[in-house]
């Protein structure tokens, strides 16, 4: 049996009771180590808490060597630990598909993830649209497919959760070309970089999916003791020191509920100014007033 076990967001003790009991009975325990990190725990503290040795599973192992993870899983119990919830990344879905192809039974044990814990910032979960990812730009590569999804969300008034890039155990193009197995230091996108890249794409596209004054919420270290929120415009957040990782960003939709706005006031520098920007932003994508069709019988 292959068990995909969510670890939650921060502490080693965030795991569920069922998840912990399952780990203790598994023959091998892998920790997926490249789509996210636990902010208040590490491999050593996890091993001490679980009482088990943990095998780090990097991108190369998960995406290129899944057969090693699944080896004998038709007879032995194998645990695959994921920060957050097991279904927070497409990579984990792919692992399940490969297991099924080998007739290996799979069970998921869920936990909190950024996808549901984001509600802690005060925005209502059912007011969120499509989630998008924002990757680090390079001089020659600035993907902007996220822009269309933000546009779609804002056209129907919904908030957009942006997941910010994480680079762990990545190789430079130069080292890859030379065949050198040298990895770059880990990089975690901060709020300043995310907001700046969003503004750069709007400047390039000029389609007004958002503006420098579009209200957003910066979310830092969600679920940890150092969790913080900061509400402001994109322009303001492009100059905001968000501190240590991990970070996410929410761009507000047009339909901001009064309770949501009242909650966000706790995280703004200037309440009246933020309210003004929200009201101005609500005019974007505002549907035209309804005009009933002419009654042909009356016109006769």
UniProtKB/Swiss-Prot annotation:
- SUPFAM superfamilies, alphabetically? Tetrapyrrole methylase
GO BP term, pick one? methylation
Q: Which InterPro entries match?
A: 4pyrrol_Mease, 4pyrrol_Methylase_sf, 4pyrrole_Mease_sub1, 4pyrrole_Mease_sub2, Dphthn_synthase
Write out the pathway annotation from the protein's UniProt entry: Protein modification; peptidyl-diphthamide biosynthesis
EC number(s): the record gives 2.1.1.314
Q: Which HAMAP family match?
A: Diphthine_synth (MF_01084)
What family does this belong to?
Answer: Belongs to the diphthine synthase family.
| Role description | S-adenosyl-L-methionine-dependent methyltransferase that catalyzes four methylations of the modified target histidine residue in translation elongation factor 2 (EF-2), to form an intermediate called diphthine methyl ester. The four successive methylation reactions represent the second step of diphthamide biosynthesis.
Q: What name does the UniProt record give this protein?
A: Diphthine methyl ester synthase
């Amino acid at each position: 049996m292959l068990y995909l076990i969510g670890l939650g967001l921060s502490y080693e003790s965030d795991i569920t009771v069922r998840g912990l009991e399952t780990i203790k009975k598994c023959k091998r325990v892998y920790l997926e180590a490249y789509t996210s990190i636990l902010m208040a725990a590490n491999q050593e503290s996890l091993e001490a808490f679980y009482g088990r040795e943990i095998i780090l599973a990097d991108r190369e192992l998960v995406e290129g060597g899944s057969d090693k993870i699944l080896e004998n899983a038709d007879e032995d119990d194998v645990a695959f630990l994921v920060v957050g919830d097991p279904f927070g990344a497409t990579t984990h879905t792919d692992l399940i598909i490969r297991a099924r192809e080998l007739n290996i039974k799979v069970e998921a044990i869920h936990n909190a993830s950024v996808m549901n814990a984001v509600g802690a910032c005060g925005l209502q979960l059912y007011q969120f649209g499509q989630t998008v990812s924002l990757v680090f730009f390079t001089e020659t590569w600035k993907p902007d497919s996220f822009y269309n999804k933000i546009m779609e969300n804002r056209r129907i008034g919904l908030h957009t959760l942006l997941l910010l890039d994480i680079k762990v155990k990545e190789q430079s193009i130069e080292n890859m070309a030379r065949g050198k197995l040298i990895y770059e230091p880990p990089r975690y996108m901060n709020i300043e970089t995310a907001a700046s890249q969003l503004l750069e794409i709007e400047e390039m596209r000029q389609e007004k999916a958002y503006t420098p004054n579009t209200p957003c919420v910066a979310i830092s270290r969600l679920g940890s003791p150092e969790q913080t929120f900061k509400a402001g415009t994109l322009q303001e957040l492009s100059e905001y020191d968000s501190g240590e990782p991990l970070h996410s960003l929410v761009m507000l939709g047009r339909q901001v509920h009064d309770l949501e706005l009242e909650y966000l006031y706790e995280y703004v520098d200037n309440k009246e100014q933020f309210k003004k920007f929200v009201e101005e932003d609500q005019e974007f994508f505002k549907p035209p007033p309804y005009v009933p069709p002419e009654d042909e019988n009356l016109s006769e």
